[in-house]
Amino acid sequence: MANVRDSDTSLWLHNKLGTSNDSWINGSICSQLNKEVLRNIKECFPDLQTQVKLKLLLSFLHIPRRLVEEWKAELEEVIEVAGLDSELWVSMLAETMKTFPATSSLNTEISDYEDTRPIFIDMVNDLRKLVTKHSDLGMLPLECQYLNKNALISVVGQQPAPVKHFTLKRKPKSAQLRTELLHKSADAQSSLKKASAPTIPLRSRGMPRKMTDTTPLKGIPSRMPTTGFRSATVPGNAAQRPNLSRTPAGRKDGGIKLIEFTEQPLGYAAAKKRKREQQLEEQQKKQEQKQQQAAAAAAAAATAAASNAGDSSPTDAATASGGETPVTPTSANNSFEIKMEPQQLNQSAGSLEEPQDDEMSGKANMECDIETPEYATATLDFAQATSTSVADGQPGKPAVETKLKTPRTPKSAAKLNNNNNNNNNNSFNHTPKRIKQEIEIKSEEIIVPASIKLEKIETSPSTQRVSIQQQPPSLVQRTPHLLIRSSPQKRQNNGATTSAGTTTTTVGNTTIKMEKLDIKPMIRATGVSPSTSAGTTTTLLTPQQLRQAANPLANLPNNISVKITSAKAKAAAAAAATSSGSQTQSQQPQTLQVQQAPQQSHPPLLINSSTPVILASSPSAQRAKALALPSSSTSATTTTTIPSQAIKTMPLSQLKTATNSGPVIISQTIIQPAKRAQQQAGTSSAAAASQQQQQQQSQQQLLHQQIQQQTQQQAQLPQQPQQQQTQYILATPQQQPQQIQQQQQQQQPILPTLTSFSHSRPMPQTTTLYQATTPSGSGQTPTKILLKTSGSSSVVMTPLRQAQPQQATAVVSSNPPPLVATSAAVVSPGQTTLNIQNVQLPNRPVTIQPASQAAQQQHMQAQLQQQQPHPQHTIVANTTATQQPKLSQVLMQPTAAVGTSGVSALNVSPTSGKNKTIILTQKGVILRNIGGDMYQQIPISNVGNMQGLGGTTLMTTTAGPPSLVKTTPSSGVQLQQQQSGKQILPTLIPTSSLGGQHVIVQQQQPTNVIGNSQQQTIIRPVMTNVGGGLTTLPQGLTLIQRPGQQPQLVQVQAAPGSTQRTIITQSNTAAAASQQQPRQQQQQILVQHKPAPTLQQRLVTSTTSGGQGQQGNPNAGLPRTVQVQVQAQQQQQPQQQQATQQQSQQAPQRRGLSLSNEHVHKAHEMFRKANRVSRPDKALILGFMAGLRENPRPNNENVLVIKLGETEEKVQQDNGHTALCLVESHIRLDYNTGEWKTFQNYRLQDQSAAS
């Protein structure tokens, strides 16, 4: 009932306020508002159109003050919901009117909306001008309207005469008619005064007269009664006066008629109504009499017939009894009742932007073959008989979009059905002016192109699920499939959308609107158990992260969506884009090479930049299991059959907090260059893997040729068509044609690549290789990189403008994900270098827009802090004139034993440095740990000569801005994935291709290069409140604020040089090569991102690039191998606990969180029934829904259970009796997975006390 009421309210609002001819509104709807209507408006407010929302809010200004006081709570709730709206005008207007119900004045102080503050200030100034302009008119006191002219003049004074601007030459016709009517009325009045006064009593004049009454009530009798009471014989008693005053029976023109109260004459309408009621009563009496007579006659006839003919048929008897033959319901067997219940359960909660189209599209997809009812009778709880002409009759709707809809099944079957359904789960539960966020994922069993319309769904009546769905995956045959399941509140109208406002259909790309989907794995990551045979265990690789990193179309604005389908092997290279993100290959070793190419050519994937579907890596426990697998298979299949990390899915609620989570290694692949395979085999693994790596050489060359064939749309190869290893290489877009692979490979020898690694260990050991594949035609240093993609939006490599052909740019959306972009060594200045920059308008500086409004104040202050001219800043020259350079600072910190040339020492305590800042007054120095908490300043010129830089790691605390922590030998920062239930989204860092000193947005050539030094870039969160003022940063630290995230410090340091207890070290051959090439640098990037107290993950990447552009010797750069030593997890626990304690003690950091409309609805429903939840608990629940992953009440399980309400209910018992139970409703917030669920506890009440 509530849904119907909400839909009626929203429909009424759209009818009243939806017209576009007037942009503002008067108080026309205020008379129809009440508390109940305002509550309904609050429920359906997010689904209204933008102009309706604005007009509704403005109409509140017309509500009388008495009603505003009475409806204060409801008005404030509506304004609060409006303040969370995604439309800036609506939220800003709601912020302006926030104080209106309480104070009857507007809110002129806005602090939260940074980017709309200038507009708001302009609006307030305009309002002030209008008020001052009209304030001199002077409002008179209220009592002045009761004064006459002389008294008003005495109170107010003589008013100035109104200015006469023009004179009419001829009076209009209306004025002439008016004067004539005035004359006539005056004449009539004068003639009335001349007439004599009537002799009727005054009380009888106003007596109502019955229209049908013929008694003359004319007032003056024709003969004046001059003889008193006409008879002197009648005594003049007062009691008999009424009788005497009656008119005689024979006289018709008497003056007065006296009646009783019961005979009081009625008006014409009332008399007519009474007459009609009397007629109806008479007719009912007549019908009852007829029925009684007919019943008596029928009974008599029936008894007579029964006595005379006992064998007469019952039909004859019925015919004789009343002539009415009973109709048996046989028609129900061949006609099916059309019900629309499952599809319209939540129809009213959907978007009302186009309610007719939404409903029609929902009906059009329920179509089924009505001629074959035998298979549909088991699941006929949804409408199947609506014809396709409903969709076709609407002009402009593409018929391509009509897809298959599965019947509504029970929840157990629905989870299995969702691989069939996941490309059709459309939901209109969004704000209308925003294009819906979209995900389309198809599994390999269901290959349904968008242009095929399925007419018939074959369901099995016993299981109630579609017969073409895939079977539940078994453990050995198929690895865990990814099931996309929409949340239960959104399971309405699953069908293709034919909404005209949002659907765009092109030849190659068919957009299909999708809702955000919760991703649930059918089999958790522990499903890949060590007991499975090594031949069938496969490493699941999802190309989704790679698509986010390299898809040139995935990062469009939120209102544009592009469907991308994968290239069909080598044939459809021109239409190549990214392959399906969540398809899973059931790889049997025998049929692997045959099956993989056709499987991956079909499933398209449609994803918006703001709808993440991330596959996160499993924790260290899973990796340990994978390491323990026996490597008994042959060397050709070892890499694939031992998965290094099982892949788990992230629920949507955690994906929404992408910017608040730490990094996660998504996928890793060993990709080795062709030249160094033998040398690497000796370094990284046992000698048995060398044969395998030689096989990988040829495979990778073939793979690279196939990739370069598809570089025009920047494709990624779905999976290498060999069984042993899974590799993805994303190439920078090129402008060459793509027909000839070999020539292109030779023409483009220095192709910078974005490489994602699916890391696999051939042997159970802790060494992992990260290498990029470069074409064999060049002799340069290969790029070694670990690519990480952000969960919130995708990063794409696209060519820059035509004026700058030497640059490729990474286009970042409004919520910019960082990206590790590396290229091969730059041979010439005209060669392609990878730079990272923001999409922006020309002639405007780079601005990073926060995704949520709450983070904007932080964001602005962080920007001011970046642009403040500190003396330590190094401004790097910009290559694009229209962009403002980011200021970056460099601080190299080799934390080692006492070395050469100590200049001075600082004593920095990690606890005392909580709210302090190390300010280096000298520009050319670095800090070096000399033991304990002592640090030593060393000039940068001495860094290149320091050889004892090994054996050191660097830790940062989350307690203060840049406090330095001393390192113990056991506290090495590891490449770790801790605590099995915690999945955190990755964070990426921009680095330049050359090992310069600057971490900048754009850089052609580094301005100053420190010779023979490796660098380490450390990004750490700043947990102090930035709003308290601008913090002075030490030299070498750059504060970076990303939208929706806490500020981070970027720090570039000298990296350790030896292999002793280091995070990332280079091998001995690489060290020797580094000494031979004094200009060659190595960049090492360490990301420390600890947004939550108990969730810590660190991500280590390394890149090696030879500075060949500066050497002038293109063959001098030797390939290098970088080994990552994964140490024991237990060493990190003390440090992690220490950081957790420090973080929990500090002031809370304000986060940029935002709630979707769906979550707002859920929270309203939850809190409306809750009677035991406090305001802090409500805030905690809302923060969790909005994506906050810091548990404010830490416990061992990192799970909170909050009591929402308790009621008393009578519950049916098993024995048939009802018992009074206390029903407690709780909500369970799992900070590990980001999921929440509500449940109820039933407690039996004491029956005696209850009675």
Curated annotation (Swiss-Prot):
PROSITE patterns: HDAG. InterPro entries: HDAG_dom, NELF-A_domain, NELF-A_N. Disruption phenotype: Loss of zygotic expression results in morphologically normal embryos that hatch as 1st instar larvae. These larvae survive for several days but do not increase in size. Loss of maternal expression causes arrest prior to the cellular blastoderm stage and embryos display abnormal nuclear morphology. Those that escape this early arrest proceed through the blastoderm stage and gastrulate normally, but then almost always arrest during germband retraction with head defects and incomplete dorsal closure. The keyword Transcription regulation applies. This is Negative elongation factor A. GO terms for cellular component: chromosome; NELF complex; nucleus; transcription repressor complex. It comes from the Eukaryota. Residues 192-254 are annotated as: RNAPII-binding. GO terms for molecular function: RNA binding. Its main location: nucleus. It holds the Pfam family NELF-A_N. GO terms for biological process: negative regulation of transcription by RNA polymerase II; negative regulation of transcription elongation by RNA polymerase II. Belongs to the NELF-A family. Residues 277-289 have a biased composition (Basic and acidic residues). Residues 128-191 are annotated as: NELF-C/D-binding.
